[in-house]
Amino acid sequence: MSTARINMLEFDSEEDLNQRAEMYQREAPELFPNAEILLTIKTGPTSAMSVSIYPDEKSAEESLIRRNKHFKAAEVQPREAWYLVGEVVQRHVK
């Protein structure tokens, strides 16, 4: 069964969020090659939620190492970041 990681991010400014989103759009497919789905939603002027779907828990755990390195090295840092992990129980993509 697929595993999802949901990241919640809060930035100091809308500009920081936009810069980070542009960088993530360019780099995420290469950073997380095992991801089946990479999705980012801007939930407010300075906040975003990203959802990554992996084929299994092992792939999700392996990506966490890359995620943590990426977060530490990123030029634009979120003010606050946390994540949840769970089993995907329903998926529909049209």
Language-model features and meaning:
Residues 1-51, 55-69, 76-94:
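Short S/T/G/P-rich N-terminal loop/turn motif that feeds into the first structured element of a domain
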